[in-house]
């Protein structure tokens, strides 16, 4: 077998080297087939994973790759070192082949080598690192036979000679240095600037594809980081379940499944460089689903919250405007109804002017509008609360309308020299009454009966704010003037006499009782030491200052009050004091003063209400 295998292998190796010296390095894209679709990429990845299952037998691989191929384009872009390693493996495989006829021994090694080379070009020639290829070329794997015979030693020597010859031919090539530099740069770029992406729907080796790190940063948004758990899970699955082709072929030469996984997928990454349309869209969608979901949800929630807040604010503004307009219409209706029914019969308001009342009314309206605006943001308000608020608003409007009606009669006495803007529209009866009044009393009442122009202007402005038309304002003014004239010509009303003030009920303090009659005078010599002059009922028990009953008091000790009171009875109050009577008298005096003040305040309030606010005929 050695005689037939070695010359054919050497010639075939020389032929391959001559054809592959001018091939482009594996890093160039012009050698590869036309761009592939996503389906073809997945199929290639699946073939790359499922191939180790049935590549252990050379005959099966030769049967799978028996399609006719062009010899000129078969090994373009193939690294010579990879071809040398494959040839060495092919030389090693026929060491223990099955028994075949002698006539067909010459063609069998060539067909097996060609099948192995074809399969290696498709699956793994680009993925073998240079260091492993060189190591396998320098130190080829041990033969499968366990016999330590001289034939095995001769074959190993021949293999070493063939490896050295291939190395010399490779060094002799003129374009070898350039190809080595480009290959090293391509491998460095592939190993350092690639990132493995995994499809989340079906994580597995058939869905893995590699992309440039620069393109990944340019296309994937910043808020869409890759999930850290997916690569680790994928690597664990690959290390546990899927064996790699390099592991079956080179045995101990492979360092780790992770390294050969990246090297196996290198053709996919190079093929992806020529694809421009499908993959960026998928990556953009995948990036948006990976990291942009949370950001999108946050943005959506913020937008919905802003829309809801704007809607609530618009609804509150609309409700406040509608409530304000409704209250204004209600106030104008109440004012007009009150004026037409004779509310102008009231008299002056005791010094309160029209401008102050109008300003107070505007302030109250602004406060109500502010309160309604604050409460407008609530969506649900009870009907009872609304009815109570409406009733309260109506009561307030009625009270203000009553006060405004009283203002119409404020200028009853008027000021001299004032001219009415509507003096030309007065009735002729009014002029006749003025003439009769002039003949009888010799006094002119035109100025008294006419309203002040400033008052009319203020009334017009107030009615405008109450949403009343100009015709209604004119009719109201005419009604007020006619009622004032009729009331002016009416007989004077009898003024009720003022109520007499109640007589003050002062509680006087009780008079002190008369002094007690003087007792018998004691001799003068008894004034110094009068201890026997004490009264019978005055007994001083021993206390803290009298520890001993027989204590002799000094002469500086003052006599008791009863002893002193005997000699000055005409100027001092009686001997017996009654504190309870004095306290009762003091309390009675305070109660009388409080009652008097209360009556005075009540009388003043009644006088103010009767003569100033609510004076009725």
From Swiss-Prot:
Keywords, A to Z, come to: Amidation, Cleavage on pair of basic residues, Cytoplasmic vesicle, Growth factor, Phosphoprotein, Pyrrolidone carboxylic acid, Secreted, Signal
The protein's PTM annotation reads: Multiple peptides are derived from VGF, with activities in synaptic plasticity, antidepression, penile erection, autonomic activation, and increases in energy expenditure.
Which segments show compositional bias classed as Low complexity? 182-192
Q: Where is the signal peptide?
A: 1-23
Care to name a GO molecular-function term for this sequence?
growth factor activity
Cellular component aspect of the GO annotation: cytoplasmic vesicle; extracellular space; glutamatergic synapse; neuronal cell body; synapse; transport vesicle
- Annotated Pro residues bias: 491-501
Official protein name in the record: Neurosecretory protein VGF
Q: Taxonomy-wise, where does this protein's organism fall, top ranks first?
A: Eukaryota, Metazoa, Chordata, Craniata, Vertebrata
Chain's gene name: Vgf
């Amino acid at each position: 077998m050695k005689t037939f295998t070695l010359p054919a292998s050497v010639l075939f190796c020389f032929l391959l080297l001559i054809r592959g010296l001018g091939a482009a390095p594996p890093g160039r894209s012009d050698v590869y087939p036309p761009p592939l679709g996503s389906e073809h990429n997945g199929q290639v990845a699946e073939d790359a994973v499922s191939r180790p299952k049935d590549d252990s037998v050379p005959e099966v691989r030769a049967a799978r790759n028996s399609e006719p191929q062009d010899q000129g384009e078969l090994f373009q872009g193939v690294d010579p070192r990879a071809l040398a390693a494959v040839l060495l493996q092919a030389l090693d495989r026929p060491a223990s082949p099955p028994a075949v006829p002698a006539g067909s021994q010459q063609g069998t090694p060539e067909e097996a080598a060609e099948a192995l080379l074809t399969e290696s070009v498709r699956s793994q020639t680009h993925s073998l690192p240079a260091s492993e290829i060189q190591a396998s070329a320098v130190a080829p794997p041990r033969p499968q036979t366990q016999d330590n015979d001289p034939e095995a030693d001769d074959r190993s020597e021949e293999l070493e000679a063939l490896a050295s010859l291939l190395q010399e031919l490779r060094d002799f090539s003129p374009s070898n240095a350039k190809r080595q530099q480009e290959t090293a740069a391509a491998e460095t770029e592939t190993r350092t600037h690639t990132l493995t992406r995994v499809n989340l729907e079906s994580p597995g080796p058939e869905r893995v594809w590699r992309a440039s790190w620069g393109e990944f940063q340019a296309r994937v948004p910043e808020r869409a980081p890759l999930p850290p758990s997916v690569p680790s899970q994928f690597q664990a699955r690959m290390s546990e379940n899927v064996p790699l082709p390099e592991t079956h072929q080179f045995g101990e030469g492979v360092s780790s499944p992770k390294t050969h996984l990246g090297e196996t997928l290198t053709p996919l990454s190079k093929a992806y460089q020529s694809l421009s349309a499908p993959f960026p869209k998928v990556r953009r969608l995948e990036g948006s689903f990976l990291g942009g979901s949370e950001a999108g949800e946050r943005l959506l929630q913020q937008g919905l919250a802003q829309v809801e807040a704007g809607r609530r604010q618009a609804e509150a503004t609309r409700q406040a405007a509608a409530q304000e307009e409704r209250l204004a219409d209600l106030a104008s209706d109440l004012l007009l109804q009150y004026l037409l029914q004779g509310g102008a019969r009231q008299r002056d308001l005791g010094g309160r002017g029209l401008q102050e009342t109008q300003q107070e009314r505007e302030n109250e309206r602004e406060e109500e509008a502010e309160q309604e605006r604050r409460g407008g943001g609530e969506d649900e308000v009870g009907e009872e609360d609304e009815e109570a608020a409406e009733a309260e608003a109506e009561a307030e409007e009625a009270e203000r309308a009553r006060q405004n009606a009283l203002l119409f009669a404020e200028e009853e006495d008027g000021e001299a020299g004032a001219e009415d803007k509507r003096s030309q529209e007065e009735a002729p009866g009014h002029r006749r009454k003025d003439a009769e009044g002039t003949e009888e009393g010799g006094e002119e009442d035109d100025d008294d009966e006419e309203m002040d122009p400033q008052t009319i202007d203020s009334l017009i402005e107030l009615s405008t704010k109450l949403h009343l038309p100009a015709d209604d304002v004119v009719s109201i003014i005419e009604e007020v003037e006619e009622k004032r004239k009729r009331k002016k010509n009416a007989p004077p009303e009898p003024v009720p006499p003022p109520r007499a003030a109640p007589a003050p009920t002062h509680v006087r303090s009780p008079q002190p009782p008369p002094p007690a009659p003087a007792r018998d005078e004691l001799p003068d010599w008894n004034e110094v030491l009068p201890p026997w002059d004490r009264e019978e009922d005055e007994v001083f028990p021993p206390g803290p200052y009298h520890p001993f009953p027989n204590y002799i008091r000094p002469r500086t000790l003052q006599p008791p009050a009863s002893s002193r009171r005997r000699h000055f009875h005409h100027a001092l109050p009686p001997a017996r004091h009654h504190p309870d009577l004095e306290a009762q008298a003091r309390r009675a005096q305070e109660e009388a003063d409080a009652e008097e003040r209360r009556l005075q305040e009540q009388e003043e309030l009644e006088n103010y209400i009767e003569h100033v606010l609510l004076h009725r005929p």
